[in-house]
């Protein structure tokens, strides 16, 4: 077979591009996602133990899976759980920031009377100010 081998005509960039394309294409033959690097990382992480990787065969992973106890990249940790459903009984919403006298605070008088909200006169005054600033 070595008699049939000929050196490539591609430069270094061309060889890297061809190799990258072959990795992406081979990934697409098995998977429809657009992240071959993630899957390659998973394969290398798990195959490293079986193939002897750097330093020889590796011990089995710590209980809990990859990313626990120093095993593997942190990217492979499971996602945290969703927050509690606010509609469930016993769930309390956290208090809103601000105090009783602050606009947008805990509510009370401002919430009932509408004080602290934009009035049509306030909006007209703001727009007039913007027009004056643009004229300068």
UniProtKB/Swiss-Prot annotation:
Residues 123-136 have a biased composition (Acidic residues). Residues 99-108 have a biased composition (Gly residues). Residues 46-136 are annotated as: Disordered. It comes from the Viruses. This is Uncharacterized ORF2 protein. It comes from Torque teno virus (isolate Japanese macaque/Japan/Mf-TTV9/2000) (TTV).
């Amino acid at each position: 077979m070595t008699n049939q081998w000929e050196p490539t005509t591609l430069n270094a960039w061309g060889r890297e591009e061809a190799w990258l394309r072959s990795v992406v294409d081979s990934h697409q033959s098995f998977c429809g996602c657009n992240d071959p690097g993630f899957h390659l990382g998973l394969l290398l992480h798990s195959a490293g133990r079986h193939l002897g990787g750097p330093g020889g065969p590796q011990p089995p992973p710590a209980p809990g899976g990859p990313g626990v106890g120093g095993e593997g990249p942190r990217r492979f940790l499971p996602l945290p759980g969703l927050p509690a459903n606010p509609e469930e009984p016993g769930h309390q919403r956290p208090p809103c920031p601000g105090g009783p006298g602050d606009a947008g605070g805990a509510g009370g008088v401002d919430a009932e009377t509408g004080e602290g909200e934009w009035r049509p006169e306030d909006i007209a005054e703001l727009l007039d100010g913007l027009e004056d600033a643009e004229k300068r």
